[in-house]
């Protein structure tokens, strides 16, 4: 099979029949399967999926809303195509872009091709500006030169999606996850962005803020997640040494003054003593945090455990 088209969705009942027809018209030269992942919709989206289901159209229905990362995780697990394509269900992504993205993977050797919405059909202040700021930061932190890291329209070699774990809100950073897994040939294609035809956008400032927090978390985990002691232990030792050096200096100064008959304030009357004590205590706490992190890391249970109500 050439392609698996994975479409995560939440309350997009009105757009689904038109989206399927658009995909069918755009991919006549390919063999493909269409996988709708209903993330706990309450507007009858599942009924629509059942109505359009067929030999090449499948559906996965969650018992409740878990988020886009969960939907992509289950969609990736179910995908059988040589190339896996993700797109949103709101008709703002154009399936007509998919053949060129597939060509880039097949002929130019890319592991992943991400869409770039150069001319967004969104509110400039509430969505476009935050998106530009977010993507600029993501480029600086990840080192991946993509203009639109969070674009829903992406194409992957199958081995990419089978070797990454998408959890929490990490769907925004799949290119970074892929890069860390060794799939570092990442391309970009400008794509047309359509105005939303049905429903309302799920984007809000809370998602914008969470995106930055997730980026920092991913950066940290990619470097120290497997060995938390490397970070906490090193920080703890450095902090302990700072406190130890300050303590030695205080004691040496006291002994010097006593040996020369000079007055010297009591150790506990000196602010430096309390700074030294604080540094030593923090150092010990950070070191212990490293041990706890190692224990949690070695005994962590599977993160992606979602309750699926139905499959078709």
Q: What spans do the regions from the language model cover?
A:
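Hydrophobic helical membrane-anchoring modules
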Residues: 176-312
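Acceptor/aglycone-binding surface of glycosyltransferases and processive sugar-polymer synthases
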Residues: 58-64, 68-78, 83, 95-173, ...
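Short, well-formed alpha-helical segments that are part of the catalytic scaffolds
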Residues: 12-26
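A conserved acidic beta->alpha catalytic loop
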Residues: 38-47, 91-92
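Short beta-strand/loop segment that forms part of the nucleotide-sugar
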Residues: 20, 31-41, 60-61
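Cell-envelope/extracellular polymer assembly enzymes that use nucleotide-activated donors
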Residues: 2-4, 33
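Donor nucleotide-sugar binding loop of glycosyltransferases
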Residues: 12-15, 41, 68, 94
